[in-house]
Amino acid sequence: MNTFSQVWVFSDTPSRLPELMNGAQALANQINTFVLNDADGAQAIQLGANHVWKLNGKPDDRMIEDYASVMADTIRQHGADGLVLLPNTRRGKLLAAKLGYRLKAAVSNDASTVSVQDGKATVKHMVYGGLAIGEERIATPYAVLTISSGTFDAAQPDASRTGETHTVEWQAPAVAITRTATQARQSNSVDLDKARLVVSVGRGIGSKENIALAEQLCKAIGAELACSRPVAENEKWMEHERYVGISNLMLKPELYLAVGISGQIQHMVGANASQTIFAINKDKNAPIFQYADYGIVGDAVKILPALTAALAR
C-alpha cells in the first residue's frame, strides 16, 4: 500500500494550502482539511478536499494552536492511523508538537520529500545545517509532518469539485496561553515562493540604505526582493518573512540574483533550485560563485545602478 487511507491538512498561511493539498492528493485516498472560516473551506474543496472541518468558537484571546485537542480527537474518531500535513511555519511546528503528543505520533519537521510504502511515511529533510540529507521512516500509526515550501507543486482549483463540510467546536484546553495584547508588525505581503524573478541581498550590500539600490533593480525588471538570514535576523534591515534559507524560504524562481551574499550552504539550500543563479560579490573566492551560472566580481553598490540602468532601457 503506497498511500494512507486518510490525510489531514491544516495551514495557518492560506498561500501554503494549495501545495499541501497537492501533496495530500499524492499521499492518501481521502483528504480532510481543517479550516478557520467558510472561505477557506470553499477553497479547500476546490483544491481536492473530500471533507472540510471548520474549527469554530475559539475566544479572541486564545491561540489557534489551542485547537490541537479537538483536532486530535477528530482525527482519532475517523481512523486508527493517518497522515497530518502542516506548513513548516512557527505555528505549524508548534501545532505539530501538540498533535504529535496527543496522537502518540512521530513528528518530522521541514520535510523536503515524502513518500509512502506499506502504509508508512518515509521523509527526507536537511540535517546538520543543510550539510546532509536525513531520511526517516515513521513507524507510528499516525505521522505528523511539517512541509518545507516548494516540496509539492501547488494544486489547481476546480470549481466543479464537491465535498462535505463539518463543524468542530472549540474546547478549552486544560493549560493554555491567553493573549493579553497584540502589536501589528510589518510583514511581507508578497508570496516570494511564487516569484519568477528574485533579487536577494546579503550583508555585502553594506547598509540598510543601500538596499534601495536593489529595490530599484527589482522595479526595473519586475522582480521581488529577498535577503539572507543575517540581513533579517542579525541586522534587522528587512523583514523575517523575506529571508531565504534552510529554516525559512525555499525558492525555485527562473532567476535568483544574489547581491553581496557569500553563499553559505544554509542559504543556498533555499536558492539552489533556481533555474539560473546570478551572483554579484566583491570577493572572487566567495562560495556563491560555485553555485552561480553567471557572476560579477565587484562592489555591488557600484554595479547595481549600472545594471539597473542597462536593464531599464
Curated annotation (Swiss-Prot):
Keyword Electron transport included in the entry's annotation: yes
Pfam families membership: ETF, ETF_alpha
GO molecular function annotations of the record: electron transfer activity; flavin adenine dinucleotide binding
SMART domains noted in UniProt: ETF
Pathway: Amine and polyamine metabolism; carnitine metabolism
Record keywords: Electron transport, FAD, Flavoprotein, Transport
Database matches in InterPro entries: DHS-like_NAD/FAD-binding_dom, ETF_a/b_N, ETF_a/FixB, ETF_asu_C, ETF_asu_C_CS, FixB, Rossmann-like_a/b/a_fold
Biological process (GO), any one: carnitine metabolic process
Gene3D superfamilies with a match to the protein in the record: HUPs, TPP-binding domain
Residues holding FAD: 255-283
Function: Required for anaerobic carnitine reduction. May bring reductant to CaiA.
Family: Belongs to the ETF alpha-subunit/FixB family.
SUBUNIT field: Heterodimer of FixA and FixB.
Matches recorded under HAMAP family: FixB
Protein known as: Protein FixB
Gene: fixB
